[in-house]
Amino acid sequence: MSSYFVNSFCGRYPNGADFQLHNYGDHSTANDQYRDSTAMHSSRYGYGYNGMDLTVGRAGTGHFVGNERTQGYSPSHSAATTPSVEPVRYTQSANSTGTSSLSPPPDPLPCSSVASSSPVTETQSQHRAVKNSITTPCSTPCSSSNGGTLLLNRDCVSKASPLEEEKPAGSAPTTPQNVSDSTQPQIYPWMRKLHINHDLAGPEGKRARTAYTRYQTLELEKEFHFNRYLTRRRRIEIAHALCLSERQIKIWFQNRRMKWKKDNKLKSMNMAAAGGGGYRP
């Protein structure tokens, strides 16, 4: 409520003693319970108030001057003061003219001064504390001796503890799986041997001996019986038919020709030895 509204209200009713402004503050305070409008503005204007005056007296510290009649707290209050059910009036150093006006309630108070604030401010602080407890657990209880605040902190701890218990439970099953993945090497298709003949690591670093199956040997012998030398096209056809490589077919035919030549040489030598031994000059 601004001072403009108060001045217009007082100007509408000139008899200030008949229409009084009520103060619904603390009834046990030393200040008077009712104050008329003429007494409020007598020190401000210095004459009997009649009509509307739009001049506003301001303090040097803010928009609203001192001696505010609203709920709040005094800077001298400590965190350990006893809670009060009704709002507490606080006083600031006003200017030399002693003017007074109404001001809106202050911002919500921090956790340490919840005990000395009004019930509305306390509920706002509790609402913020419950919001913070969802994200972060309550570290330590408030420094005030308010019983409601301590119970609130216990609730915060009880709400935060299930969240902390669920996190290790959810991360526990993933740990053995990560360990098993790290210990077991992953085998890709290109790492597997397609054929036993493709092994390049021998006992002495040499190429391992190719072990042909019975069917492969029979087919190669048939082909060698008809052709001692193979063309490249025929070699590719045999390699696809027998699931072998062109190099293996070529090497097999080379070895087979060497063996055939060796057999023919031994046969010719035996025939020469047999014929030469029978001939005498």
Curated annotation (Swiss-Prot):
Q: Where is this motif: Antp-type hexapeptide?
A: 187-192
Q: What domain of life is recorded for the organism?
A: Eukaryota
Q: What is the lineage of its organism?
A: Eukaryota, Metazoa, Chordata, Craniata, Vertebrata
> Where is composition skewed (Low complexity) in this entry?
132-144
* InterPro entries xrefs: Antp_homeobox, HD, HD_metazoa, Homeobox_antennapedia, Homeobox_Antennapedia_CS, Homeobox_CS, Homeodomain-like_sf
One BP annotation, GO: anterior/posterior pattern specification
Q: Which gene encodes it?
A: hoxa5
Q: What is this protein called?
A: Homeobox protein Hox-A5
SMART domains per record: HOX (SM00389)
Please give the start and end residues of each transmembrane region: none
Concerning its family, UniProt says: Belongs to the Antp homeobox family.
Annotated region of DNA binding: 205-264
Per the record, where are the segments of Polar residues compositional bias?
68-99, 114-127, 172-183
What the entry lists under Pfam families is as follows: Homeodomain
Region described as Disordered:
65-144, 162-183
Task: Name one cellular component (GO) term.
Answer: nucleus
